[in-house]
Design a protein with these regions (language model features):
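Flexible mid-to-C-terminal extensions adjoining Fe-S/redox cofactors in radical SAM and related proteins
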Residues: 1, 23, 238-331
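Conserved alpha-helical substructure of the radical SAM core
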Residues: 1-96, 100-103, 295, 304, ...
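Residue-level marker of regulatory loop/turn positions in helix-turn-helix DNA-binding domains and
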Residues: 1-2, 216, 225, 271
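The −1 position to Zn-ligating cysteines in a subset of zinc-ribbon hairpins
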Residues: 12, 16, 223, 278-281
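Flexible loop residues that form catalytic
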Residues: 25, 59, 109, 175, ...
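Radical SAM enzyme [4Fe-4S]-AdoMet core and its adjacent flexible, acidic
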Residues: 29, 77-80, 100-103, 107-255, ...
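Short, solvent-exposed loop/helix junctions and linker helices
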Residues: 33, 64, 149-150, 276
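Short glycine-rich, flexible loops that bind phosphorylated cofactors or substrates
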Residues: 63, 113, 291
Length: 331
């Protein structure tokens, strides 16, 4: 059952984050942007196939000149939309995106300006707080997304204070091991898990931490549903298999997606999802979030309290605030 589309609308980025392979611009500076007509065709088909969530991702998604049109199109199809941005371009698109993004995430890697800018290798710390001001003036409640690393995990209390100061949810994103990037140490896992426990204004999927303690995905008893519940589409109009981070094959979208989903190649990848050698020990968050969507195993059950808490913040608390908070003109 397809739930989520990770749609890479660009591989290009305007930052150089040390924990992200998109930070190496030499590999991506000449890559194409997703075409709007192809996007609309694909997303329209996905809506009919039952996809409920779409992450407009990159790279830096706001580098795409049609990002607002893409968000509007998906939103009008009743999809839940999400964007994660470093905010450098958010002021340019803020008004056009307002009301069209269900989950708007502003990336902040440290409460200290110097450290954040060093990690990103670009001066963008002040842009985040300017963007928070603009977003809230438009009735938006972005989350502050903190990608926790072995170097920054002890900054978590200060990040919580900073998010609370702006009346926003802190979304804790534990770094995962991929493209030679190390994952969290056991000490960091324990610290983060203990700190976040019971805090209503902090979201951490507890299943992510259990998965790390258990050594990641086990290919002999896989937890991953990266093919059956997620579809990954590239800017080149290809379906990436089994996932972006361990791309092993690609299928050009040159026929209806429903036909592709029934193809022998897709059935092969669904049958073997989480079972490939490279799947051993995997902890890539963006595939395990939908993998734990239904309470069918201990990981999914572990994630329930976290998801209920986040849903309360986004669907109840913030909606009430939006209703009673007048919009003001952004500067």
């Amino acid at each position: 059952m397809l739930l989520l589309c990770n749609y890479y609308i660009t591989y290009r980025c305007n930052a150089y984050c040390e924990f992200c392979h998109f930070g190496d611009h030499t590999n991506f500076k000449d890559t194409p942007f997703a075409k709007l007509d192809e996007f609309k065709s694909n997303v329209g088909q996905l809506a009919k196939l039952g996809v409920k969530f779409i992450d407009l991702t990159g790279g830096e998604p706001l580098l795409h000149k049609d990002i607002h049109l893409m968000a509007e199109f998906a939103h009008n199809l009743k999809m839940q939309t999400s964007i994660t941005t470093n905010t450098l371009l958010y002021p340019k698109f803020a008004e056009k995106l307002a009301g069209k993004i269900n989950l708007l995430h502003f990336s902040l890697d440290s409460p200290d300006e110097e450290e954040h800018n060093r990690i990103r290798k670009v001066d963008c710390f002040k842009s985040i707080f300017k963007s928070i001001e603009i977003a809230k003036s438009l009735g938006e409640f972005p989350d502050i997304l903190f990608t926790v690393t072995n170097e920054t995990y002890k900054k978590l209390p200060r990040m919580n204070e900073l998010a609370a100061k702006h009346d926003l949810v802190l979304l804790v994103n534990p770094v995962f091991s991929y493209f030679s990037n190390p994952g969290l140490s056991q000490e960091a896992v324990d610290y983060v898990d203990e700190y976040c426990d019971g805090k209503m204004d902090v979201y951490l999927n507890k299943a992510f931490m259990k998965l790390r303690r258990d050594g990641g995905n086990d290919i002999h008893n896989p937890s991953c549903k990266a093919v059956s519940r997620v579809i990954v589409i590239s800017p080149k109009n290809e379906i990436i298999l089994p996932c972006y981070h361990f791309a092993n094959d690609k299928i050009k979208i040159d026929r209806p997606i429903s036909e592709i989903r029934k193809s022998e190649k897709l059935r092969y990848f669904i049958k073997n999802e989480g079972k490939f050698d490279f799947c051993q020990g995997c902890t890539v968050n963006c595939y395990f979030e939908p993998s734990f969507a239904f309470p069918t195993n201990l990981y999914a059950i572990s994630s329930l309290t976290s998801k209920f808490k986040y849903s309360y913040n986004k669907l109840v608390k913030q909606k009430i605030k939006k209703k009673f908070t007048p919009k003001t003109e952004s500067r």
